[in-house]
């Protein structure tokens, strides 16, 4: 059941990143408690990979990126409106967060959104097939100690994923 929830969750995140960020919040409120443990394993790996590839800055974290994506998305700043991932990231970084709104967004929603954004960035940066980051998410969730950030980053950069 947890794998089904993770798969559904990541699929929802990828769709939401591409279309409507509100879907992320809805999904996370429904399934977040069930996949919280898995998110705790996935998030640090995605964060380390995204930072190593320069997708997010050293002092940024997945949850903050997710919070920005959700709030900016509600204001019309959507990934699909940008031809380059870096331009989108600049836009959400410049977006003024509402601290009160941040308090109302669950950590699961922020984390799911941040993982989705990082995944889309990985796909663009490394010319990966669309939505391939979903498979990466499942690999990490299945065994985060084996599929750690160093191992996954090496595979991604070499193009030789087993």
Q: Can you say where each PLM-predicted feature lies in the sequence?
A:
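Hydrophobic faces of alpha-helices used as interaction surfaces
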Residues: 2, 6-13, 17-42, 46-49, ...
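Amphipathic, membrane-inserting segments
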Residues: 48-162
């Amino acid at each position: 059941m947890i794998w089904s929830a993770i798969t559904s969750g990541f699929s929802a995140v990828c769709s939401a990143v591409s279309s409507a960020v509100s879907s992320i919040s809805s999904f996370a409120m429904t399934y977040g408690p069930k996949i919280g443990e898995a998110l705790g394993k996935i998030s640090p790996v995605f964060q380390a990979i995204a930072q190593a590839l320069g997708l997010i800055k050293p002092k940024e974290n997945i949850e903050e990126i997710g919070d920005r994506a959700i709030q900016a998305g509600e204001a019309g700043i959507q990934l699909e409106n940008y031809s380059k991932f870096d331009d989108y990231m600049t836009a959400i970084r410049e977006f003024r967060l509402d601290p009160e709104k941040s308090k109302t967004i669950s950590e699961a929603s922020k984390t799911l959104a941040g993982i989705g954004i990082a995944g889309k960035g990985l796909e663009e940066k490394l010319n990966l097939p669309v939505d391939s980051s979903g498979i990466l998410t499942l690999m990490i969730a299945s065994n985060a100690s084996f599929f750690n950030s160093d191992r996954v980053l090496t595979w991604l950069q070499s193009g030789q994923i087993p």
